[in-house]
A protein has these predicted regions:
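The conserved beta1-alpha1 loop
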Residues: 4-9, 69, 190-191
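Conserved HGGG/HGGXW glycine-rich cap/lid loop of the alpha/beta-hydrolase fold
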Residues: 1-45
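Short beta-strand/loop motif that positions the catalytic acidic residue
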Residues: 181-182, 188-190
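Flexible "cap/lid" loop of the alpha/beta hydrolase fold
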Residues: 85-121, 162-165
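Conserved alpha/beta-hydrolase catalytic His-Asp/Glu region
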Residues: 121-174
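Gly/Ala-rich beta-loop-alpha elbow adjacent to hydrolase catalytic centers
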Residues: 68-72, 76
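Catalytic histidine-centered segment of alpha/beta-hydrolase-like enzymes
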Residues: 211-226
Length: 239
């Protein structure tokens, strides 16, 4: 069972290394980079989902299960309109949109706009703030943040234009129509204490107890087991 692992904003594929010792034997995981991250050449910006699809097509085979975390989940969903669909899509810490109306938690449009302004002024400092922000819901937030910094370093492995494009996608992507009538089975998972998601988005997902937005740091073994379990269930569903 092939799993293609897709990371979120400002975080390259090294985030998935914590799961390497915990995958059950049928799973063949492969963590891939988005354009502009790691050694993957960046796309010219501004760019489109169609251009992203053209670049990512060799990395996203249809005979696999895609696993998209955070922005990676939003992008993977949007790509369903442009690429042959996978056997299934697992969304981790992602809903149909990034921003919420603020009535039941999550990140509001005003909060994201403030973050974008801060990023334009000081990209690296704002990225470091984001690492602290997304670690907040973990049971040991300081330890989760320490792990993030140790794994990712002092600066993002992505160029500033790529990161700015990612923030624009967080602002604008709306996958409600796609998720209402998807071309493949879709299963959702979320940390029970993920402060970046609204409570209504978390309630639509299989919740991982004692985890926030980064369950690969706080709950690597349970997360690997749940991803394998949900992928197996999704593969048994009619397409």
């Amino acid at each position: 069972m092939k799993l293609i692992l897709l990371s979120g904003w400002g975080v390259d594929r090294r985030i998935w290394q914590t799961l390497s010792e915990h995958w059950p034997s049928p799973v063949e995981p492969s963590a891939v980079e988005w354009p502009g991250y790691g050694e993957s050449p960046a796309l010219p910006t501004p760019t489109s989902i169609a251009a992203l699809a053209k670049r990512m097509a060799p990395e996203l085979p249809s005979d696999a299960v895609w696993v998209g975390w955070s922005l990676g989940g939003l992008l993977a969903t949007a790509l369903l309109d442009h690429l042959p669909p996978p056997k299934a899509l697992l969304l981790l810490g992602a809903g149909s949109r990034f921003c919420s109306d603020g009535k039941d938690g999550g990140v509001t449009h005003d909060e994201l706009a403030s973050f974008q302004r801060a990023f334009r002024r000081a990209p690296v400092a704002t990225w470091r703030h984001f690492l602290r922000w997304q670690a907040q819901g973990e049971p040991y937030a300081r330890e989760a943040h320490r792990q993030l910094r140790a794994r990712l370093g002092e600066a993002p492995h992505a160029d500033t234009d790529t990161l700015a494009q990612g923030l624009m996608w967080l602002e604008t992507l709306d996958n409600r129509a796609l998720l209402a009538s998807p071309p493949c089975p879709i299963h959702r998972l979320a940390g029970a204490h993920d402060s970046l998601l609204s409570s209504s988005t978390r309630q639509q997902a299989l919740q991982l107890e004692a985890a926030g937005h980064c369950p690969m740091l706080s709950q690597p073994a349970p997360l690997a087991a749940r991803l394998a379990e949900q992928a197996t269930r999704a593969l048994q569903e009619p397409r």
